[in-house]
Amino acid sequence: MSQVVIKQQAGPLPIKQSFMWPSSESIIVAVSGSAWTQKPNTLLTLQVLVDDKVLGTIQQLAGAASTHLALPTGFFAINRQISQAVLTLAAGNDTTVTDLNDQFTVALIF
């Protein structure tokens, strides 16, 4: 089964979404999105948090400045009890930039 909790939501980051966590079994959190930077040869970093705890980080080297880049899709495993949850996508450093031209999707696979 799968459940989309953020669907093609435009930036900027951070993006927060509250939802009911669907299972007490292990779940894979799949995250995709894009970002850009104002400086060439900079590491783009996207942090994925559940209940304000870092679940994982997605990184992509931006060779050119001012170009939106697709980030690699991140897959992160987590065990958690069924209850209300808050998922947050946030820039992982001060050189990662997002705006309304960047879109983010998060799906739970269980």
List each language-model region with its residue ranges:
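Terminal beta-strand-rich extracellular "head" domains
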Residues: 7-9, 30-106
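Solvent-exposed, flexible loop/coil segments flanking beta-strands in beta-rich domains
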Residues: 1-25
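Extracellular and analogous surface-interaction loops
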Residues: 16-26, 75-82, 109-110
